[in-house]
Amino acid sequence: MAFRTALRRVAAVNAAPATRLAGAGAGAATAARRSYATASQLTHPDPTEDSPSGKMVREHVPYMVTTYSRPPPVFVKGKGSYLWDLEDRKYLDFTSGIAVNSLGHCDEEFSKIIAEQAQELVHASNLYYNPWTGALSKLLVESTKASGGMHDASSVFVCNSGSEANEAGIKFARKVGKVLDPSGSKVEIVCFQNAFHGRTMGSLSATPNPKYQAPFAPMVPGFKVGTYNDIAAIPSLVTEKTCSVIVEPIQGEGGVMPATEEFLVALGKRCREVGALLHYDEIQCGLARTGTFWAHSSLPKEAHPDILTTAKAIGNGFPIAATIVNEHVASKIKVGDHGTTFGGNPLACRLAHYIVGRLADKQLQEGVKAKSEVFLRGFEKLRNKFPSLVKEVRGKGLILGLQLSEDPTPVIKAARERGLLVITAGTNTLRFVPSLLVTEGEIEEGLKILEESFEAVMVKA
């Protein structure tokens, strides 16, 4: 029953748009007579209720809180840029776990480290030192400075997830504000429209989207919302009452929207003027995804942050995150101000130490830039072939967005049923965040499937 309901939901979503995908034009009637690819013609038709995947979903769904609406495939294996489902069908993955698996699925050394460290020490708590928390912190600080980013990076708080990293940043900012102004008035935190910083109450309060906030209102007080890339509004937005400004150099969930250099420089300058902290959330766009170690690594020092948060790629699928701060922040944080039970455990930190070392490699970063060009050339061809459907290409490196004129859900389904996994972002945007080790051949393969998916959906329309 649950699987049938899930299938009905998917079908309803894909059948819902009454609007036609623009571009069918005068040939729409003729094109419509050509049958849309049937299940027998598709290479990866969604599993049926009676398939192994369908049976597993039907068994498990009643016991799972419905926080996600998932398509039918059940993935059981991954390697490099590919996933395999329960029916042993191979999918090219351009999502990498939502910008998580930057080294691809089941990297050999990554898997080896898990096995080795699990036999030595997994957890002993933060009441004691271990060899890897400090080693990871040192590597993060040194790699950050060497990259040209956050020139005064000083120390690191290690935790488990992006939301936790941002919560730490929010707490640290409030503490600094109270130290600087004991009256308690310097507590406001500025965030921006279309931002996404997490789902716990502090990070959610910095995520001004009614879809996420409304069911859990009221939010944590003291958050102000500004318009992304609006330089003129900064002086009135960031004031003496501001303790922190939290911003993504590239908004991921918000539609793959890059901040301009001028905007980030102006934010940094204003923060210094009023004694506020600048907090960059690079959870999705950081760690080599843009072709530099951090998305802000190419910015001048006046645009560097006081707080820098990272997660996702730092664990390549294993739960770990970090909040990097400068000495101005670190000097205000005392024993007992914050903590974490599992954060900084030796297994997670040893894995992250390996991953950060790989992602800090200049050759890998140059490879990201080269692969980005392959995507961009392919996207330009798609834009020329489907001008009324593909409106804009955004992003940098291997965090890219294709702005469509219509709901991309049918395209995502058509691509999945042809063996390609892509996801959405913002409004009508296809998001591409593949493994940073994706090959040019795999990119070309994915672009071909994407083109076929556009054609199939337009025929159906």
From Swiss-Prot:
Give the record's family classification: Belongs to the class-III pyridoxal-phosphate-dependent aminotransferase family.
Gene name, per UniProt, is arg-8
Protein name according to UniProt: Acetylornithine aminotransferase, mitochondrial
Q: What is its EC number?
A: 2.6.1.11
In terms of InterPro entries, this protein maps to: AcOrn/SuccOrn_fam, Aminotrans_3, Aminotrans_3_PPA_site, Class-III_PLP-dep_AT, PyrdxlP-dep_Trfase, PyrdxlP-dep_Trfase_major, PyrdxlP-dep_Trfase_small
Biological process (GO), any one: arginine biosynthetic process via ornithine
- Give me the reactions it catalyses: N(2)-acetyl-L-ornithine + 2-oxoglutarate = N-acetyl-L-glutamate 5-semialdehyde + L-glutamate
Q: Indicate where this protein resides in the cell.
A: Mitochondrion matrix
Hey, which pathway is this one from? Amino-acid biosynthesis; L-arginine biosynthesis; N(2)-acetyl-L-ornithine from L-glutamate: step 4/4
Return the annotated region ranges for Disordered.
36-56
**Keywords in UniProt for this one?**
Amino-acid biosynthesis, Aminotransferase, Arginine biosynthesis, Mitochondrion, Pyridoxal phosphate, Transferase, Transit peptide
Q: Could you tell me which residues carry N6-(pyridoxal phosphate)lysine?
A: K312
Output the Pfam families linked to this UniProt entry.
Answer: Aminotran_3
HAMAP family on file = ArgD_aminotrans_3
The main location class comes to mitochondrion
> Which top-rank group of organisms is this from?
Eukaryota
Gene Ontology cellular component list: mitochondrial matrix
Cofactor (UniProt)? pyridoxal 5'-phosphate
Listed GO MF terms: identical protein binding; N2-acetyl-L-ornithine:2-oxoglutarate 5-aminotransferase activity; pyridoxal phosphate binding
- Organism in which the protein naturally occurs: Neurospora crassa (strain ATCC 24698 / 74-OR23-1A / CBS 708.71 / DSM 1257 / FGSC 987)
